[in-house]
Amino acid sequence: NSKYFHTGSHLYGYWLAKDKIRKTKTIILVEGQGDVWRLHEAGIENCVGIFGSSLSDAQSRLIQTSGALTVVILTDNDEAGQKAKMSIREKCSTLFNIIEPEFSGDDMGDMTIEEIIKEIKPQLDGKYA
């Protein structure tokens, strides 16, 4: 956060993902920028970062206006990731279908492209572009 940029008011990468979100009716939420980059490298472009471990009300409103019907929660397998998952679930479970893929690593950003293709993509059931 800074005087001119408040992370809780934005979703990282939304400007790149918005057309893919509308096309697939699915938004994939990850914690950080590195996670967004890694998923893009694996061909999953309807993903955005929440800048940390909790979803703000402003970010929730952005998701509600994104055209998504499904929210994929793809946070890390550490304590912060579990906190983020709970925050997202609390704000989105009554408004969206929720998908929570499982993966073997701790950090999404540390996975190889091959691991994402093998472990994550099949669980998305074609809800990516």
Annotate the PLM regions.
Residues N1-S66, A84:
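Phosphate-handling DNA/RNA-contact segment within nucleic-acid enzymes
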Residues D19-K23, D107-A129:
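Short, small/acidic-rich helices and loops at N termini and domain boundaries
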Residues L29, S66-A80:
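Acidic beta-strand-to-loop metal/phosphate-binding motif
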Residues N46, T70, N97:
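Residues at the starts of beta-strands that form the adenosine-phosphate
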Residues F51-S56, D76-E79, F103-S104:
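Short, acidic/turn-prone active-site loops that include or flank metal/cofactor-
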Residues S66, S93-T94:
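Arginine/glycine-rich "motif VI" loop of SF2 helicases in the C-terminal RecA-like domain
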Residues K83-S93:
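Short, aromatic/basic amphipathic alpha-helical patches
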Residues N97-D107:
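A generic structural motif
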